Amino acid sequence: MSSIRTMVRGAYDIQKNRIQNGNRLVGNFKVKLGLPPSTKENKLDKEGKIILTNLRNSYKLLTEGVANFPRQANFKGDEVISDYTELCLVDNYLQLEGQEKNHFRRLGHTLEEYPIYTDYLEGIRGVGPAMAGVIISEIDITQAEYPSSLWKYAGLDVASDGQGRSRRKEHLVKKEYVDKKGKTEERDSITFNPFLKTKLTGVLGASFIKQPADKCKYREIYDGYKHRLENMDAHKEKSKGHRHNMAIRYMIKVFLVDLYNAWRPLEGLAVAPTYSEAKLGKTHKKAA
């Protein structure tokens, strides 16, 4: 499992590097074109995407039919890529983009060795190989005795103050660590896996709500829960964004319960009912 985790983390490291290079590249050409820089660092705005498309097209024209990368002495630019340095910057970005695609493609092949992927995750709309890789590599299902164990590990449990788990000071716990001198000390630490939480709520959640509700159970759950919040006096005053985040959180918690119920039997492990099933007799329909 450590090997696939290294592969998944490596893929996302390449992706992060590619995004950073893309932002710098677009920023450079925005300055050249006299456009204001983007305010978002983690993704491109509409103008940025158009610039990248134009750069790709220009790069293709300038390098088409050339066996080796052009040398500076022989370089002749166009109205988009006008000097050799710009050509090198675009080439670097496209190389990273290619590495990223290859890495995620190989990850998809690797996942075929895992029954939880071939028998379950692969068939769920909105869960691609990259997200399946995150789930399989970050979660040790043998350590999740209850569905709530997954919620806690993913940072989706409720803290002692009744609020959703976060990095707030009141949600931190004391954990021991060994300092540089080999001495055991204590420090305030989070209780969850931040990488997993970010991918589940930020990436998987967004993927689910892009699916049609009649073909994705989790989109249907999101819509239903958000509608309930909008019609509850206790939540009417909350912003749309707050209710959206609450619905995403709820949807992912249901997904984790379904994941638990599918994964544990595949590993020959006992399955415990959720609190709502054990105490209230409520059940969720299976994912499709």
Cite the ranges covered by each PLM segment.
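Long, charge-rich intrinsically disordered scaffolds of nucleic-acid metabolism proteins
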Residues: 1-110
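Short, hydrophobic/amphipathic alpha-helical patches that form generic packing surfaces
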Residues: 5-23, 27, 133-138, 198-206, ...
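Extended non-catalytic scaffold regions that mediate assembly and binding
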Residues: 39-48, 182, 188-189, 284
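Eukaryote-specific, cytoplasm-facing alpha-helical/coiled-coil scaffolding segments in long proteins
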Residues: 40, 161, 226-232, 277-288
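Coiled-coil termination/hinge junctions
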Residues: 102-141
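Phosphate-backbone recognition surface of nucleic-acid-processing proteins
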Residues: 120-121, 134-245, 249, 262
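A glycine-rich phosphate-binding loop feature that marks nucleotide/adenosyl-phosphate handling sites
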Residues: 126, 167-175, 275-280
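Basic, amphipathic alpha-helical segments enriched in Lys/Arg and hydrophobic/aromatic residues
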Residues: 239-275, 284-287
